[in-house]
Amino acid sequence: MRASQFLFATLKETPSDADIVSSQLMLRAGLIRKLASGLYVWLPMGLKVLQKVEKIVREEMQNIGGQEVLMPMTQPAELWQESGRFEDYGPELLRFTDRHNRDFVLGPTHEEVITDLARGELRSYKQLPVTFFQIQGKFRDEIRPRFGIMRAREFTMKDAYSFHVDQASLEVTYQQMYDAYTRIFQRLGLNFRAVLADTGSIGGSASHEFHVLAGSGEDAIAFSDGSDYAANVELAEAICTDERAAPTQDKQNVSTPKIQTNEELAKFLDIPLHTTVKTLVVKGHRINEDGSEGDEQLVALVVRGDHTLNEIKAEKIAEVATPLTFATEEEMKAAGLKKGFIGVDLDMPVYVDRAAAALSDFVSGANEYDMHTTGMNWERDATITDVVDIRNVVEGDASPDGKGTLSIKRGIEVGHIFQLGDKYSKALNCTVMGEDGKPVTLMMGCYGIGVSRIIAAAIEQNHDDNGIIWAKTPDIKDSIAPFDIAIVPMKSKEDTVMQTAEALYEELKARGLNVILDDRNERPGVKFADLELIGIPHRIVVSDRNLAEDKYEYVDRRDGEKQLLSREELLAKVSL
């Protein structure tokens, strides 16, 4: 490709509404342009990157037997009503009515459509297992689109769906998909982690997320320094190895005027923060003998003062209402509770986190305004309904697998795989004839990759003050840089420079390398700045002075090192 025939849409200034580095650099490098809130045009430079990511994803899906399909973005609302998600999904699901007064949705995901396809096309267990995938646009009506294409309303996604006669078959494909995702991110040269995850609105049982590690990531992930254990902080089990010591203090109420937080309390009493507890009161219900939900009641959740409540874990307590809802001020007053000073000796179920349950001589609220109680001890002064894991893990916690300690880092979710089970196949009556001649409800797996999101995540992980640095890949042909090599001929009165640049350009193309000849009528400084901004990994400068010595100036974008190389050395360098 010749630069004079290609759209270089670089910007000198950063758009004011670009809120993170990847968005700023993608706009400045001319990869994308904003059309409206959460909607972006992919320019030629950016589309080349997008298509390269799609190619790697497509190859790995096909390598494990995935069959590519293409489903419409517009979906009949009746399918979503049949699955039960039409109302559950919320306002992110864009609903509309066509001219014939029929209801439709703009697809944020395709579980319903693929299940409808499967129930119409799959007849026998002999056709299974089978995996279908597509790479296609999705639409989610985000309330606050932000971070460029990271959280856009319209985005490109690879979604795959597998169908099975039993759980054992699903687990085999799930592992194959896990391995394929691992290969995809390895081929892309990204620093990533696969972590245990929550199934969310998709539903199902087992689930893993794939995160690109970056300081700007929205998610916190915990991983061990002594094993391959990794999990989303929301799901990581919090281990407590401490044993409760015998009491050494008597309980005593102390005045704590205007103290609002545990941090203020610890400072006021000159004690370690971890020797305090906080009590959070949520809505709940009694559990009847038959296991059904009974009358409404309030439930107390107690964690250490230096820990935070994990709402996902708390929702797993049978007596806690879902979604987790904190008691209102009126409800607490009716129960005789003093907001900000709630203790642990309460006339309601009291669920205590493991770490808080290991405390002795701790400080809690006194159930009186401007008062706390020191020297509190479990069993002697307050009763525990049950000891549970209801907190987020923190840096330095013991790893749940017993190997090493946990580190916490930020991550950008770029992939998510689920074992759906029969949630959708049962709702949509998707069955095949089993080996025994009887109908079998299919088991399903669901596997998504944010194709466009990968690009933003890669830039968040790899950039400098001059622009994008595309990650070095094990195979140069897997590089997702729009061009891998740029040849810059310097202006000269002689034809030799351009002729040499043209010859080198043709040779590199013949070797199957992705090269651009920057023949634009621009100053060298402008060309160099553009190429650094876009992140072209290899830059070759052809000039009179260096050709006199049969040399080429080579610059590696990743380290900025300049070298004078012979033709043979140059060809060896850019072919790595």
From Swiss-Prot:
Annotated protein name in UniProt: Proline--tRNA ligase
Domain characteristics, as noted in the entry: Consists of three domains: the N-terminal catalytic domain, the editing domain and the C-terminal anticodon-binding domain.
Keyword Transcription regulation: no
GO cellular component: cytosol
Family in the record: Belongs to the class-II aminoacyl-tRNA synthetase family. ProS type 1 subfamily.
Enzyme nomenclature, EC number: 6.1.1.15
Assembly: Homodimer.
Keywords assigned by UniProt, alphabetized: Aminoacyl-tRNA synthetase, ATP-binding, Cytoplasm, Ligase, Nucleotide-binding, Protein biosynthesis
Reaction catalysis annotation: tRNA(Pro) + L-proline + ATP = L-prolyl-tRNA(Pro) + AMP + diphosphate
Function, in words: Catalyzes the attachment of proline to tRNA(Pro) in a two-step reaction: proline is first activated by ATP to form Pro-AMP and then transferred to the acceptor end of tRNA(Pro). As ProRS can inadvertently accommodate and process non-cognate amino acids such as alanine and cysteine, to avoid such errors it has two additional distinct editing activities against alanine. One activity is designated as 'pretransfer' editing and involves the tRNA(Pro)-independent hydrolysis of activated Ala-AMP.
HAMAP family: Pro_tRNA_synth_type1
Superkingdom of origin: Bacteria
Listed transmembrane segments: none
Location of this chain's protein in the cell: Cytoplasm
Biological process (GO), any one: prolyl-tRNA aminoacylation
The keyword Cytoplasm is annotated on this UniProt entry: yes
PROSITE patterns xref list: AA_TRNA_LIGASE_II
Single Gene Ontology MF annotation: proline-tRNA ligase activity
